[in-house]
Amino acid sequence: MEEDNIVDSKEIENNVEDKKEETPSSSPSPSSSLQQQQEEGGVVKQAVSNLVSSSITLHDDAKLIQVTGKDEPFHFISVPMSVEFLNLEDVFIMQSDAYIFVWCSEQANIKKKAKAVQMAQKLKVEIGCQRAVQVLEIGEEHPTFLFCLGVPKGTKLNVTKEKNDIFQVDEDDEEQVLEPEFFLFKIFTGTDGKPSIKPMEEDEGINQEMLESSACFILDCEHEMYIWLGKGVKKSTKDTLIPVAKKIWTQYDRPEYYGKLKLQPIITWVFDGAESCLFKSKFSKWVEKAQPLQTSYLSLSSKKKEALNFDVSSMHQDKEVPVINIGAASDYSNGKLLVWCSGGGSGNKWNKVEEDDFGIFYSNKSYVCHFIYKPENKNSIRSVIFFWEGLYSNQRNYIGYKFGLYKEIQKKMEGLKSDDPVEYRISQNKEPQEFINLFGTELLVLNEELALKPMIFQVRANRGTQLFPDPDSCNAKLLNSLDSFVFLFPNKYIIVWHGKVSTEHQRELAADLFTFLPPEYEAGVKEFDQGKESDNFWKIIGGNSNDIVINTFINENKEEKEKEEEEKEEEEEEEEEEEEEEEEEKDNNKTTTIIKHLRPKKIKLFLCTDNSGIFKADQINPFSQVDLNSQECVLLDVYHKVFLWKGSKSTDQKLNDTQDLAKQYIETANDQRPSDCSVELVEQYNESPLFKSYFHSWKVTPPKVFIDPIISYKQKLAERLQKEKEDLEKLKQQQEQEQEQQQKENNKIVEEVKEEVKEEDVKEEVKEEEVKEEEVKEEEVKEVAKEETKEEIKEEVNDEATEVKEVNQVEEEVKEEEVKEEVKVEVKEEEVKGEAKEEEVKEEEVKEEEVKEEVKEVKEEVKEEVKQDKEEEVNEEIKEETKEEETKEDDNKEDEKVNEENETVNEENEVGIIVSPPSEKVDEANSSSTISSPENEGSVSVKDKRKSNEPITPSVVSSSGDLLFAYEPYHGPPIHSSNSPKQGRKGGRKSHGKNQPQHKKNHSVDQSPLSSPIIPNKSLNLDIDNQSFDLNSINNNNSVEVLDGASSPLSFSSSSINSNSTHNTPSKKNKNKNKKKHNRSSSLTHA
C-alpha cells in the first residue's frame, strides 16, 4: 500500500508536502515463474497474487484456490498461480475481480465440484464480480484462465499430475497422507506490556465460540495464516501481530514447495463481523450473527391497513437535498486538496493523483478526496473526506481505505492538532454540489484508460460521462432530447450534438469537453442541434432522426389570437403592412396551435418498501441506477408519465401495492400535469430506451438466465467448427497468394541475376587487362632496382677509407629501397587482391618470392667480398700489433700488478660471455656495428682502437669477422628475459632510419637474453684460433670503469673466458613437469 503523508501545520495555507511510505504486501506472482513474495509489511493483502495485465482485461489480485480432500469437509487452500500445482483429482477456483473460473477434470468427485461452485458463488458476491461463475473442463479453458497461469498463447493446457502432492506424508507410513490441521493462537498484551501467545486447544477442533471481540487471534492453517482482529483490540496489540505471525510460521514444518520456491507466508487480515468465506470454511460450523429485526411487531393484516393510511400527499412535497457545510470560504482558495485513487482490487494500494488530473475520474476505481482548510474567522484546522465510488469499482476498496489510508490521514490530522476528518461516502452520478466545487464547475468520468479510438460522452448538468455502449448499438439510439452528446474521433473531428431542451451550461461543457483530454485528442469541433443534422452527421453516427429518444413532453394549448390595430405615425410603411395582416386575421377568424417541447419540471424517484412495517414510498434525491433494488418496486415520475419499475426478485404483493400507490399519486397531483398521464410498467432487464434515458450513463447489466450446458456445448462446438472452416479457407487463400508472390519474386530474381552476370563478365575483362599492365610495370621496376643495387654495391666496395661505414649505408639504402618496393608491391597487391581472382594472387606471390631470393643472393655475394677484404686487413693488423707488444713489455708488467690487485675485487663477480646466435636476415646490418663504452658514445671501430693502443672490448662476432663480446653481471642462475630476440630485432630495425644519426651501439647486448643458451658460431671459432689478444689488458682497463660507472651494463671479472660455455636453462618440458608435480602435491595436501 502506498500511503501519502500529509502536511506540516506551518504550510497549510500555502502548499502541503506529501511524503510516501511503502508497505509491501506478501503475495506471490500469478505467472509461471513464481516470483518471490515480499517479506516486510504492516498490512498484508488479502489476495495471493499481484496485478495481472492481460490483452483481454485486467485481473486484480488473481489467485488460485485448490479444493482438495477425500471426504467432506473439503479444504480450500490458496496455492501459487502455476500449472505445476494443477492435478486431475482436485477442483480449482481462479478468482479475480473480472472473472471467476472453476476448473476440474472428469476424475474429480461430484461433491467436490458442487462445493467448489458453491464457494465460487460466495466469492463472487464477496468481491463484487460482475460476471457469472464459469465452469471449465480440460480442453475448454478460457483464454484468460490460461493467461493467468502463464500458458503461452496458442498452446493447450497439459496436466499430467493425477493426485495432490501438497500435503505432508506420514513419517511412519509413507503411503498415508496427512491432511492439514488448524491451530488457533490468542494474542494479548501481558502485564509487562509485551505480547503473549496462548494456544487454544480443544478435542473437537476449533470453533467460532473461541473468538473473542476483545482479543486478536492467529489461525495457522499450515499452508496459510489468518489474523482475526476483534472490535475492542488495542492499537498496541495490532502493531505486533505481523512479527508474531511470522515467528509462528518459522517454528513449525511447512509444505515442501514453500522451501523449493522460497515463498513467503500468506497472511490475510480478517475483521470481526466482516469475515471472508474462506476464513469461515476453516471452522467446522460457522453461525451468522443474528441481524436486527427489520419488520414491525404488527401483523400482515395491520400492514395493509397502515399502508392505506399512508399519506400520499407527502410524495408531492420536494425532498430537500442535505447540504454539506464545509465551513470554508466560498472559493475554496484557502485550503489544500489531496486526492488518491485505488490501485488494486483489494483497496490496500492507493496512488496519489496529480493536480493536473483533478476532476477526472474512472468509473472502475474509487477515489479519496481529502480537503484541508481553515474555517472563516478561526485559527483551527479542519478537514473533510469524500469517498467517491465508480459504477464499476470494487466494494472492498472502502474496507481497505478504512483500515489503511484513513488511519494514516487520522494520524497526520492529530499531529496538526485537528479533529478527525468528517467523511462523506458518495457514488457516481450522485455527487453533491459541494464535492463538485472542489474541482471547479465540471467533472469528467471515464470508463477505461485513454486510447486513440472513438469515444462517446454524455453531458448532463455539470458532469460529462463516457458511455460504455454495446458495439452493435452505437448509433442514434443513444441520443435523447434532455442531454448533449460528444462524439470524439482523435486527430479527425469532434461532433457535438445538443438535444432540444438541453441547457446552456450543458452546451458549453460539451463544446469544451475535449480540453480535459491530452492535446492529441484535439480536432475541429462541429456542433449540431436536434432537428438540424446534416446527411454527413447520420453517415458518421448511424441511424436517423426517428431513433432519437424524445424524453420531453409536448404542451398543446389552442388559443384564438386577436391582435389590436395600432397606428404608428413615425413609420408609415410598417403600419400599412401590419394593418393588412390584422384585417386578414379578423376576416378569417384563424385559430393557431402552438406545439412546444418542454423539459420535465421535476423528475422524482420513489423507492417503495415495507421494511419499516408500513408500505410507503421514500423519495431518493439525487437518484441513479444504483438505487434500483431488485427486491423492491420503484416509481419514476417524469411529470407527463409515471414508470413503475419491478425488480426481478420483487413479489406480486409489492407490485399490486405499488400500482395502487401510483394511481393515488396521479389523482392527488395538483401540478397541472397532462390529463393523459398514465402508469407504465417496466420490468428489470427489459427496460425501454425512454426509461433508461432519464438515468445518467445507464450501465448495461445482462440478466441472469440459466443456460443448459449441453446446449451451450453444442453451440460452442458448432461455432468452433465454423471457425475452423473459415480458417482453412483463409489459409488456402493465403497459400495461393503466397505462391503467386513467390513466382513473381523468383522471376524478378532470375532477371536480376542475368543482368549481374553480364556486368561481372565485363568487369572481369577490364580487371584482366589492368592486371596485365600492372605485371609489366612491376617487372620493369624490379629490373631497374636490381641494376641500381649492383652498381651502388660495386662503387661502395672500391672505397677503402670508408669501407665499414659505406657498407652500412649501402645496406641501409638497399633496405629502404626494398621497403619502399615492398610497400609499393603490397599496395598494388592489395588493389589486385580486391579485384583479381584467387589464382592470379597466387602467381603474384610466387613471383615476389623469386625477386626476394635474387636480392638475397646479391646481398650474400657483397657480404662475402667484404668479409674476405676484412680478413686480410685484420691479419696484417695483428702482425703489426705483435711487434708493438714486444716493445711495450715494460708497460704490461705494470698492468699485471694492477690486475693482481683487481683479482681480489672481481672474485665475487663472474662474467658470462654471450655469443649471439647466427643472426637472421633482418639483423645483419645491426650485427656489424660495434659496442660503445659507457664513457665514449661515439662510434669507434676496432681498427682505430688497436692503433691507439687502447684495450679492445670484444662483444660478439659480426659478419665481417670482428669479435664483439657482451658482458653482463652474473646474478646466479640464468633467468629468462621478458623480451624475445625477435622483439629486439624489430626495435633495432626501426632505430636505423635513412635520415637518423648512425650511433654504433652494441644491439646484441639488449637482443640476447641471459637465459638463452649460447650457441657457438663457426666463424667465431675460426677467428679465435687465428687471433691473439691479452685478456689482462682488457680486465685492467675495463674493470675499474665498471666499478666507477654503476650505471654501465658491462662488468668484468678475472675468471677465464670460455667461448663454448653455456647456461643450462630449464626447458618447457621440465617446467610442465614441475607444474604437474606441484598440482598433485597441492591436491594431496588439500586432501
UniProtKB/Swiss-Prot annotation:
PANTHER family listed in its UniProt record: GELSOLIN-RELATED PROTEIN OF 125 KDA, VILLIN
Function of the molecule: Involved in phototaxis. Required for coupling photodetection to the locomotory machinery of slugs. May be essential in the natural environment for the propagation of spores.
Compositionally biased region (Polar residues): 925-939, 950-961, 1018-1040
Ranges in a coiled coil: 550-598, 710-912
InterPro entries, alphabetized: ADF-H/Gelsolin-like_dom_sf, Gelsolin-like_dom, Villin/Gelsolin
Compartments in which it is found: Cytoplasmic vesicle
Disruption phenotype: Severe defect in the ability of slugs to orient properly towards the light.
Compositional bias ranges of the Basic residues kind: 983-1002, 1066-1080
Family: Belongs to the villin/gelsolin family.
Biased composition (Low complexity): 24-40, 1047-1065
Record Pfam families: Gelsolin
Subunit structure: Interacts with rasD and abpC.
SMART domains cross-referenced by the UniProt entry: GEL
Identification of the protein by name: Gelsolin-related protein of 125 kDa
Compositionally biased region (Basic and acidic residues): 7-23, 732-770, 779-808, 817-840, 849-900
Bias (Acidic residues) ranges: 562-586, 901-910
